[in-house]
């Protein structure tokens, strides 16, 4: 079994520098680099995937639009949405891209079912749905067997900006969130549910290496090696997820 580092970022994180940090991590990682999962919430932003078509952006208003290198069409990120960026070595995990996506979907659905939400994936479209409403979007990039980008799980957020786009390229697609079924709901409670399931379903050692990290620390990947940074300006705790 393999170790994984789970980094948790506080505050609302701007998209562009976080995306650049993911790219840098992926470009510089080697076969022995430990996999990482980054948990955070973004400042309001629309992101357009590589397959994105302009007609799916109905009215972005004053919310920034960033064209990225992930798969998929346009989606929205904002406060109250849990982002999980999956920086994994798929070859080491023995996963094809298709199996990787299905494992993500099944893990998210399993975590939502623990809250009594009847969530499931769809064969025809990536993501996790409750009936015909989408609750979790998935957009990935795999380079030389290394994945980055990840998933966006709607927890307790303002869903209004989704009406300004055709979410994931589907006209009229309705979005939903955990808060619509479990109210009140806390972000930390969602993390406590989903983390152990990810560790189990992807075959990682438990407990995970839990790290409180700042955006500035991640940006330093442009200048310093992982080994030089380890243990600096961050608090590392090996805590079991219950």
Swiss-Prot record:
Pathway: Protein modification; protein lipoylation via endogenous pathway; protein N(6)-(lipoyl)lysine from octanoyl-[acyl-carrier-protein]: step 1/2. Residues 31-206 form the BPL/LPL catalytic domain. GO terms for cellular component: cytoplasm. GO terms for molecular function: lipoyl(octanoyl) transferase activity. The active site is at 168 (acyl-thioester intermediate). GO terms for biological process: protein modification process. The record marks 134 as: Lowers pKa of active site Cys. SUPFAM superfamilies: Class II aaRS and biotin synthetases (SSF55681). Its EC number is 2.3.1.181. Its main location: cytoplasm. Pfam families: LplA-B_cat. InterPro entries: aa-tRNA-synth_II/BPL/LPL (IPR045864), BPL_LPL_catalytic (IPR004143), Octanoyltransferase (IPR000544), Octanoyltransferase_CS (IPR020605). It is found in: Cytoplasm. Substrate binds at residues 70-77, 137-139, 150-152. Keywords: Acyltransferase, Cytoplasm, Transferase. It catalyses: octanoyl-[ACP] + L-lysyl-[protein] = N(6)-octanoyl-L-lysyl-[protein] + holo-[ACP] + H(+). Belongs to the LipB family. Catalyzes the transfer of endogenously produced octanoic acid from octanoyl-acyl-carrier-protein onto the lipoyl domains of lipoate-dependent enzymes. Lipoyl-ACP can also act as a substrate although octanoyl-ACP is likely to be the physiological substrate. In the reaction, the free carboxyl group of octanoic acid is attached via an amide linkage to the epsilon-amino group of a specific lysine residue of lipoyl domains of lipoate-dependent enzymes. This is Octanoyltransferase. It comes from Coxiella burnetii (strain Dugway 5J108-111).
